[in-house]
């Protein structure tokens, strides 16, 4: 296949990168700790640890896992917490010990946590005690699970007095720690102390060794563990580092990371910035907008990552306009489509465009991105990054013509080895010649830029015509009185499906008729919403901030006064 996008590559970005420059993520970490020893590596809540401290602390945790717990190469170790300084210490400790990281969403319910621990076969788990009660219920239900438990408190990486005050406030003032009781628990601080006095066995890791079991698909069925090897992750770090190299300087950058490290988007971005010696500032709870904005004011951050809903929330926050953004070079977005109105507002306020990128858990996750040189919202996801192939295939597996919609498929060294213990599911997502089926519908233009029209499963079919929810949502979001919107398909006897929109208004003055009039200016008749439902509460989202269309689509019908067929006469 012809890589037509290479004709439009920025001059400073190579077509291929050396994906074999490092044998493993352990080697990436070691090199950064040597090069940037005294620079801050990770920061959180006003405290930070240097690369030297990250090296020492992760070594101690690795030694504890090997010697005190007796875990072996390839054993799975779960990490269940929000963004805290303990996270990178534990993560790199697990990898240095030759073991596999299983990132766990701390908001998981008992059944969700139960599934992930049993499916992964986790031998140990590090959990923030705020969520230990959930783990307790899983262990009580399944006494056969022999999982070693390490607990930590929010302030465990802070100086002694601040740690004491923080932990007391979290537990007794804010009452954020439900009662829990688990036998034979080790505290994180004790684990580090134990490891400090023990020798670390050097594990010779290679590209084929598994680094992460990254669970995905929980919103559409039973979550599956994507097997991400050290080779996958090293490749993606190298690819993305090459993509940003022209704009960023080694040892001089500060990344604002408000997205959780247990999500692969934030995880890999953090690894990329760790490679170049940046200061990774971790935000524990970006939903606390006042505290978030206060934290923004403390740093001269040069790069940030986010999703559409986060950027919009910042723009709507009263204090954001006072934040000094003169040092910002890059605002990257992924996880969901960036709406035109959000991108335009962000550029107007900050002077920096939102650079939209695309990937999946199964691609570690980076696969396609807009170049950093864009000046405004492009409406597409950009070009394949170095050493990556992308194509649009029809249902028979043939490449579509330029501009013709099909399924976006990807090949490259960052593509997962498969799903953990799911050969049947693995077979479903790969073509016979090695393409990963992304499940996203889209097309490639004559410049080699890709545009997503929508998720294959989210597509709405109206009388045989394909309607893409992203387009509907983008149009509705342009209305100044719309806070949030989701478009889904609703059953209809005549047309099979009709477009339904669920809207959160900024003001009750917004009527169905006004919204329909707005839509008619931008949408052809069959794309017009035939059902408009107004809600007062925020729309359901993943922890990354992505609206859960499936949950809205499957929700029981509301009472007539809450959901009306407003467009019946359209």
Label each region the model flagged.
Residues 234-254, 264-302, 317:
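Conserved AMP-binding/adenylation subdomain of ANL enzymes
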Residues 3-7, 27-50:
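AMP-dependent adenylate-forming
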Residues 87, 108, 115, 125-131, ...:
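AMP-binding/adenylate-forming catalytic core of the ANL superfamily
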Residues 358, 377, 391-409, 428, ...:
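Conserved beta-loop-beta connector loops within the AMP-binding
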Residues 149, 164-168, 298-305, 315-376, ...:
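Gly/Ser/Thr-rich phosphate-binding loop
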Residues 96-193, 507-508:
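Structural core segment of the AMP-binding/adenylate-forming
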Residues 21, 38-72, 78-84, 88-92, ...:
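Conserved AMP-binding/adenylate-forming core of the ANL superfamily
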Residues 68-72, 195-208, 213-256, 268, ...:
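Conserved adenylate-forming
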């Amino acid at each position: 296949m012809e890589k037509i996008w290479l004709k439009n590559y920025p001059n400073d970005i190579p077509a291929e990168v050396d994906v074999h420059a490092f044998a493993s993520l352990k080697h990436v970490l070691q090199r950064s700790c040597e090069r940037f020893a005294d620079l801050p590596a990770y920061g959180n809540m006003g405290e930070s640890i240097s690369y030297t401290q990250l090296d020492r602390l992760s070594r101690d945790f690795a030694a504890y896992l090997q010697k005190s717990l007796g875990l072996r190469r390839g054993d799975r170790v779960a990490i269940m917490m929000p963004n805290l300084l303990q996270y990178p210490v534990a993560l790199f400790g697990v990898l240095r010990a030759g073991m596999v990281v299983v990132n766990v969403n701390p908001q998981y319910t008992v059944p969700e946590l139960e599934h992930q621990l049993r499916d992964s076969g986790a031998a140990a788990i590090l959990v923030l005690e705020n969520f230990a009660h959930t783990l307790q219920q899983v262990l009580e239900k399944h006494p056969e699970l022999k999982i070693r438990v390490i607990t930590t408190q929010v302030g465990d990486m802070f100086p002694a007095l601040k740690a004491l005050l923080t932990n007391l406030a979290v537990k007794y003032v804010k009452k954020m720690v439900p009662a829990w009781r688990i036998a034979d628990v080790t505290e994180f601080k004790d684990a580090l102390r134990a490891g400090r006095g023990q020798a670390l066995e050097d594990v010779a890791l290679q590209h084929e060794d598994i680094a992460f079991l990254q669970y995905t698909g929980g919103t559409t069925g039973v979550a599956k563990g994507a097997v991400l090897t050290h080779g996958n992750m090293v490749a993606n770090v190298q690819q993305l580092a090459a993509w940003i190299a022209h704009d960023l300087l080694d040892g001089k950058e500060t990344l604002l990371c408000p997205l959780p490290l247990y999500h692969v988007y934030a995880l890999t971005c953090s690894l990329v910035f760790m490679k170049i010696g940046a200061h990774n500032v971790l935000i524990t709870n970006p939903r606390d907008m006042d505290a978030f904005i206060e934290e923004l004011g403390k740093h001269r951050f040069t790069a940030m990552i986010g999703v559409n809903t986060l950027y919009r929330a910042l723009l709507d926050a009263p204090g954001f306009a006072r934040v000094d953004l003169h040092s910002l070079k890059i605002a990257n977005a992924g996880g969901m489509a960036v709406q035109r109105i959000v991108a335009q507002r962000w550029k107007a306020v900050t002077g920096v465009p939102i650079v939209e990128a695309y990937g999946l858990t199964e691609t570690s996750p980076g696969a396609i991105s807009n170049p950093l040189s864009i000046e405004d919202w492009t409406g597409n996801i950009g070009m394949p990054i170095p050493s990556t192939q992308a194509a649009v295939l029809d249902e028979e597996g043939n490449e579509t013509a330029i501009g013709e919609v099909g399924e976006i498929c990807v090949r490259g060294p960052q593509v997962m080895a498969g799903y953990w213990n799911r050969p049947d599911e693995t077979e479903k997502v790969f073509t016979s010649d090695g393409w990963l089926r992304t499940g996203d519908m889209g097309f490639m233009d004559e410049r080699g830029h890709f545009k997503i029209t929508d998720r294959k499963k989210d597509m709405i079919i109206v009388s045989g015509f394909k309607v893409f929810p992203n387009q509907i949502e983008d149009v509705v979001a342009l209305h100044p009185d719309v806070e949030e919107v989701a478009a889904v398909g609703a059953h209809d006897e005549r047309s099979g499906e009709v477009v339904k929109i669920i809207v959160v208004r900024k003001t009750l003055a917004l009527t169905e008729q006004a919204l329909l009039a707005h839509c008619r200016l931008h949408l052809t008749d069959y794309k017009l919403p035939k059902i408009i439902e107004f809600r007062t509460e925020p729309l359901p989202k993943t922890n990354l901030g992505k609206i859960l269309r499936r949950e809205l689509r499957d929700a029981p019908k509301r009472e007539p006064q809450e959901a009306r067929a407003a467009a019946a006469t359209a």
